Amino acid sequence: MASSRVILALLLAAAAVMASSAQLDEKFYSNSCPSVEAVVRKEMVRALGAAPSLAGPLLRMHFHDCFVRGCDGSVLLDSAGNSTAEKDATPNQTLRGFGFVERVKAAVEKACPGTVSCADVLALMARDAVWLSKGPFWAVPLGRRDGRVSIANETDQLPPPTANFTELTQMFAAKNLDLKDLVVLSAGHTIGTSHCFSFTDRLYNFTGLDNAHDIDPTLELQYMARLRSKCTSLQDNTTLVEMDPGSFKTFDLGYFKNVAKRRGLFHSDGELLTNGFTRAYVQRHAGGGYKDEFFADFAASMVKMGGVEVLTGSQGEIRKKCNVVN
């Protein structure tokens, strides 16, 4: 009986996701703000030209937004009073680019006051971050509204880098995302960097023994040694490491090549090799011969994720500034 209730709940959640995402439209602003994509892209070209490493964080920010309360811009809200917002929760304390999101939103507000949501601005920025990193381009369905609530404790819905395969599949399924979405969106790790503390448990404390021999046995030894040379202790809270060594500013197939060799940075990356479907996908694209196929898959999964639990119509609001409600 309990399992039946769980299945019913998942089906109802999936139906709600599909209903809300169906209300999004690539041409939503064609009359009210036809220049919105050009305005966003102009700011993105300028910013990534000066700091190309910002692409990964912006993509990650959109992902973190969508997995908590849906793609409603709640990750952008500041904490207020006694209420701690998502951005100040532990999983989000390493997010960066909030100031740049505000700059882009200000440019959009200047062009079209009170028209385009922060959630839509962030979705467009994530798309352009990928495209300007030599990744795929896709049409972004628009029409999201901004949420008014942001709760730090709800960030437990975010898949942690330590997650095993069962945890990953459950967290993705809760957002109506399947195994293909899991392996495809994980490959967003082809751009960007990570702090050592997100993975040093694999190097020094995998089973809780906290000694030099307590390593993740699924991690390739030479790669492990290289990571140890950069992250010298569990207490390293500042060092940044490339997630896709050598091409962390380029959106390519490098992620799959690394994971196939057991050189995925996070434990969650390595877990993709424990399932037949995701392992086959990794191995197929590790060969480097199907870039267009992966790009199309990534675009499709980003559109699907971008429709998770969105607010539309008269729900929510259109924030004037992304860090505070109106």
Swiss-Prot record:
Ca(2+) 2 binds at T190, D244, S247, D252. Pfam families: peroxidase. It catalyses: 2 a phenolic donor + H2O2 = 2 a phenolic radical donor + 2 H2O. The keyword Metal-binding applies. Keywords: Calcium, Disulfide bond, Glycoprotein, Heme, Hydrogen peroxide, Iron, Metal-binding, Oxidoreductase, Peroxidase, Pyrrolidone carboxylic acid, Secreted, Signal. The active site is at H64 (proton acceptor). Heme b binds at H189. Its EC number is 1.11.1.7. Disulfide bonds join C33-C112, C66-C71, C118-C322, C196-C231. Substrate binds at P159. The record marks R60 as: Transition state stabilizer. It is found in: Secreted. GO terms for cellular component: extracellular region; plant-type cell wall. Residues 1-22 form the signal peptide. The keyword Calcium applies. Its main location: secreted. Its cofactor is Ca(2+); heme b. GO terms for biological process: hydrogen peroxide catabolic process; response to oxidative stress; response to stress. Ca(2+) 1 binds at D65, V68, G70, D72, S74. Gene3D superfamilies: 1.10.520.10, Peroxidase, domain 2. Belongs to the peroxidase family. Classical plant (class III) peroxidase subfamily. Removal of H(2)O(2), oxidation of toxic reductants, biosynthesis and degradation of lignin, suberization, auxin catabolism, response to environmental stresses such as wounding, pathogen attack and oxidative stress. These functions might be dependent on each isozyme/isoform in each plant tissue. This is Peroxidase 1. It comes from Oryza sativa subsp. japonica. The gene is PRX74.
